[in-house]
């Protein structure tokens, strides 16, 4: 039994780096590809957005005096590098994959056309959205929210390295409180770092649920799709 039909999976660039903190860890890439293959074998339609923080962070570079717009474009290119790496890992497992970018790169990717992206999903292809929104000042979290709404995804799944949403950083505070469910309003009120404010607001306005879960535990993604209570569900709640 599959709980969700169409899912947008958001993976941070840092998670691809593994223990090294930089670059792309082949083992992590392989593990993510295995999880996505299991999901497609269940009949789920999978779209992905990958960050670029393992290669370049535009906001950090801007803080170090680089022009913010230039830095953000460099960050967008970093997401394309990660997307190409994951596309290769998926295709080696026999999964038909399309890389779709917000910036035209005709030699390596299709331009983003909503109807075409949806058609790929309907045909059982995995769609990777690269280059963010194509505009500076917007994060890949916001890009994930936007693309999820455009393709009419049932849910955004944000893969992290912790179990879900806590009231403080569980890696620093062993007594941090875990939330199995939480409303968008409480996320905003408590200033919890689920996604940036623009991304959360987009999801709230379009009643798009978010599940935050530990992507580093093998099989978690598949268990979530089967309806097991994995991670934290961010939803409308009582407003």
Curated annotation (Swiss-Prot):
Q: Name one GO molecular function term.
A: UMP kinase activity
Q: Known EC number(s)?
A: 2.7.4.22
Residue positions annotated to bind ATP are 10-13, 53, 57, 160, 166, 169
Residues annotated as binding UMP are 52, 72, 133-140
Does ATP-binding show up as a keyword for this record?
Answer: yes
Q: Which SUPFAM superfamilies match?
A: Carbamate kinase-like (SSF53633)
User: Which Gene Ontology BP annotations are present?
Assistant: 'de novo' CTP biosynthetic process; UDP biosynthetic process
Q: Any idea which UniProt keywords this protein has?
A: Allosteric enzyme, ATP-binding, Cytoplasm, Kinase, Nucleotide-binding, Pyrimidine biosynthesis, Transferase
Q: Region Involved in allosteric activation by GTP: what ranges?
A: 18-23
- If you read the UniProt record, what top EC class would you report for this enzyme, in one word? transferase
**InterPro entries (UniProt xref):** AceGlu_kinase-like_sf, Asp/Glu/Uridylate_kinase, Uridylate_kinase, Uridylate_kinase_bac
Tell me where it resides: Cytoplasm
Note whether Transferase occurs among the keywords.
Answer: yes
Regulation of activity is described as:
Allosterically activated by GTP. Inhibited by UTP.
Q: Which pathway does the record list? A: Pyrimidine metabolism; CTP biosynthesis via de novo pathway; UDP from UMP (UMPK route): step 1/1
Write out the catalysed reaction. UMP + ATP = UDP + ADP
Q: Which GO terms describe its cellular component?
A: cytoplasm
Stored NCBIfam families: pyrH_bact
Instruction: State whether it acts alone or in a complex, and with which partners, per the record.
Output: Homohexamer.
- Could you say which protein family the record assigns here? Belongs to the UMP kinase family.
Q: What's this chain's function?
A: Catalyzes the reversible phosphorylation of UMP to UDP.
- Protein name, per record: Uridylate kinase
């Amino acid at each position: 039994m599959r709980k969700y039909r169409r899912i947008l999976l958001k993976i941070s660039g840092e998670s691809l780096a593994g223990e090294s903190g930089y670059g792309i860890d082949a083992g992590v890439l392989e593990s993510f590809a295995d999880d996505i293959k299991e999901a497609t074998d269940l009949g789920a339609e999978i779209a992905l957005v990958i960050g670029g923080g393992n290669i370049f962070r535009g906001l950090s570079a801007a803080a170090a005096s680089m022009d913010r717009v230039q830095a953000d474009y460099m960050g967008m290119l970093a997401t394309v590098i990660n997307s190409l790496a994951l596309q290769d890992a998926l295709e080696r497992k026999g999964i038909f994959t399309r890389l779709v970018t917000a910036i035209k790169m005709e030699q390596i990717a299709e331009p983003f056309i909503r109807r075409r992206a949806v058609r790929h999903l309907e045909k059982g292809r995995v769609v990777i959205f690269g280059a963010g929104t194509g505009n500076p000042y917007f994060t890949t979290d916001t890009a994930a929210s936007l693309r999820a709404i455009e393709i009419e995804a049932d849910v955004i799944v944000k893969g992290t390295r912790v179990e879900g949403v806590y009231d403080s950083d569980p890696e620093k505070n062993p007594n941090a409180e875990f939330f199995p469910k939480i409303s968008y309003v409480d996320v905003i009120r408590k200033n919890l770092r689920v996604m940036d404010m623009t991304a959360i607001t987009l999801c709230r306005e379009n009643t798009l649920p978010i599940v935050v879960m530990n992507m580093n535990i093998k099989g978690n993604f598949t268990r979530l799709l089967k309806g097991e209570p994995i991670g934290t569900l961010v939803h409308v709640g009582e407003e």
